[in-house]
Amino acid sequence: MIKEKVRVKIIAIDFNSRKGWKLYHNEDLYGNTEIADDRFWNDVQEGYYKFSKGTTLIADIKCPWKIEEPLKILKVHEVIYGD
Protein backbone atom coordinates (compact mmCIF):
# COMPACT_ATOMS: atom_id res chain seq x y z
CA MET A 1 0.00 0.00 0.00
CA ILE A 2 1.26 3.47 -0.85
CA LYS A 3 1.06 6.03 1.91
CA GLU A 4 2.13 9.64 2.04
CA LYS A 5 2.00 9.99 5.82
CA VAL A 6 3.82 7.36 7.81
CA ARG A 7 4.62 6.94 11.49
CA VAL A 8 8.17 5.78 11.93
CA LYS A 9 10.21 4.74 14.95
CA ILE A 10 13.86 5.59 14.47
CA ILE A 11 16.61 4.27 16.70
CA ALA A 12 19.12 7.09 17.07
CA ILE A 13 22.62 7.18 18.48
CA ASP A 14 23.16 10.59 20.04
CA PHE A 15 20.44 12.86 21.36
CA ASN A 16 22.76 15.45 22.83
CA SER A 17 23.77 16.96 19.51
CA ARG A 18 20.39 16.51 17.77
CA LYS A 19 21.86 17.64 14.47
CA GLY A 20 20.43 14.94 12.25
CA TRP A 21 21.07 11.31 11.39
CA LYS A 22 21.70 9.29 8.29
CA LEU A 23 18.79 6.85 8.01
CA TYR A 24 18.29 3.84 5.79
CA HIS A 25 15.13 2.13 4.62
CA ASN A 26 14.65 -1.60 5.01
CA GLU A 27 17.41 -3.22 2.98
CA ASP A 28 15.17 -5.88 1.43
CA LEU A 29 12.69 -3.33 0.12
CA TYR A 30 14.90 -0.40 -0.74
CA GLY A 31 18.45 -1.64 -1.08
CA ASN A 32 19.61 0.37 1.93
CA THR A 33 18.59 3.65 0.36
CA GLU A 34 19.48 6.71 2.38
CA ILE A 35 16.71 9.10 3.42
CA ALA A 36 18.31 12.36 2.36
CA ASP A 37 15.43 14.79 2.00
CA ASP A 38 16.56 18.20 3.28
CA ARG A 39 13.12 19.18 4.53
CA PHE A 40 12.97 16.15 6.82
CA TRP A 41 16.39 16.89 8.31
CA ASN A 42 15.53 20.56 8.72
CA ASP A 43 12.42 19.55 10.65
CA VAL A 44 14.51 17.28 12.88
CA GLN A 45 16.91 20.12 13.63
CA GLU A 46 14.07 22.54 14.32
CA GLY A 47 12.65 20.17 16.91
CA TYR A 48 9.43 19.21 15.15
CA TYR A 49 9.84 15.58 16.17
CA LYS A 50 9.18 14.29 19.65
CA PHE A 51 12.06 12.70 21.53
CA SER A 52 11.13 10.12 24.16
CA LYS A 53 12.55 7.21 26.16
CA GLY A 54 16.26 7.05 25.62
CA THR A 55 17.26 6.67 22.02
CA THR A 56 13.91 6.47 20.26
CA LEU A 57 12.76 9.27 18.00
CA ILE A 58 9.03 9.17 17.31
CA ALA A 59 8.38 10.89 14.01
CA ASP A 60 5.13 11.58 12.21
CA ILE A 61 6.54 12.18 8.77
CA LYS A 62 4.48 13.81 6.05
CA CYS A 63 6.60 12.41 3.28
CA PRO A 64 7.58 14.56 0.30
CA TRP A 65 7.80 11.31 -1.66
CA LYS A 66 5.56 8.27 -1.89
CA ILE A 67 6.70 5.17 -0.01
CA GLU A 68 5.34 1.68 0.38
CA GLU A 69 4.48 0.14 3.72
CA PRO A 70 6.12 -1.08 5.76
CA LEU A 71 8.87 1.50 6.13
CA LYS A 72 11.46 0.09 8.48
CA ILE A 73 14.69 1.66 9.61
CA LEU A 74 17.52 -0.81 9.22
CA LYS A 75 20.28 1.18 10.85
CA VAL A 76 21.21 4.68 11.86
CA HIS A 77 24.55 6.41 11.74
CA GLU A 78 25.52 9.46 13.73
CA VAL A 79 25.45 13.10 12.67
CA ILE A 80 25.84 13.74 8.95
CA TYR A 81 26.25 17.50 9.16
CA GLY A 82 27.20 20.00 11.79
CA ASP A 83 26.23 23.51 12.81
Model-derived regions, located:
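Short alpha-helix capping/helix-loop boundary micro-motifs
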Residues: 40-47
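Flexible glycine-rich surface loops and low-complexity tracts that mediate binding to linear polymers
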Residues: 8, 48-71
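Hydrophobic residues on conserved beta-strands that form the core of alpha/beta folds
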Residues: 5, 73-76
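A generic structural motif
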Residues: 12-14, 65, 80
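Short peripheral tails and domain-boundary helices/loops at the edges of structured domains
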Residues: 77-83
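Long, positively charged binding patches that form subdomain-scale interaction surfaces
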Residues: 1-38
